[in-house]
A protein has these predicted regions:
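FIC/Doc superfamily catalytic core
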Residues: 1-235
């Protein structure tokens, strides 16, 4: 299967899309982690408004995601390497994980699968990143880096969030859109992810993400349509 870019935006346009929909992306990331929070509650937390019915730990995770996204925006155009992943994790899992910003140093089990990820070694992680960065197509490269990060479980916690944000750095830098799992696909995504962990079904996982989990805007097509209708773009 080919993983040609679904969207062809400039970096600035892709950043605009990400910032415009940031609450939605953070909300969906929270839901992916099993946080039972509504969109209005997520918005209130991000805006530092008073919110009821959400655990303090969950508020922290959502706030950390906000800071992590800002770190991604600030890192556009900078190298993708182990230092970036660790610095990103410092934002994703601050005051939440056993350690943040440092590679996992012990074994643990992943719920729903018999797969036990090996303890990561810095040199092997950096080699894997360099190998993945050679994938020619940026969309495929982003998806593979995300799935690799999730399966590798580089950190004690926050691996899904960290891996998806790292993938979105590459997506944005290439104007390819944003990877985000829709709520209606959460159950299926987790099922496919568990199968990937257990049976190494990488292609199946890649295809699902490509078909169902990429968001964006085709600005060129939209602008052409508006010009045909003699309308002024509302931008």
């Amino acid at each position: 299967m080919e993983y040609k870019p679904k969207f062809h935006m400039t970096v600035e346009q892709n950043i605009f899309v990400a910032k415009r929909n940031i609450v939605d992306y953070i909300w969906k990331s929270a839901r992916l982690e099993g946080i039972n929070v509504t969109f209005p509650q997520t918005y209130a937390i991000i805006e530092k408004s008073r919110v009821n019915g959400v655990d303090v730990e969950d508020i922290l995770k959502i706030t950390n995601l906000k800071h992590a996204w800002q770190y991604v925006f600030d890192s556009i155009g900078k190298p993708m390497n182990l230092d970036f992943l660790c610095n990103l994790h410092s934002e994703v899992a601050r005051d939440e994980a056993l350690m943040w910003g440092k590679l996992r140093t012990g074994n643990f089990f992943i719920s729903g699968t018999s797969y036990v990820p090996p303890i990561p070694k810095a040199d092997e992680v950096q080699s894997a990143i360099q190998r993945l960065l050679t994938i020619p197509d940026p969309t495929e490269r982003s998806i593979e880096i995300m799935l690799w990060g999730m399966k590798s479980q580089l950190f004690w916690d926050g691996n899904k969030r960290n891996s998806m944000l790292a993938a979105n750095k590459i997506m944005i830098e290439n104007g390819c859109g944003i990877i985000s799992v829709p709520n209606e696909c959460l159950e299926k995504f987790n099922e496919i992810l568990c199968d990937y962990y257990t049976n190494d079904t990488l292609e199946q996982a890649k295809e699902f993400v490509y078909e169902h989990c990429i968001d964006g805007i085709d600005f060129t097509e939209q602008q052409d349509d508006e010009e045909d209708e003699d309308l002024t773009p509302d931008m």
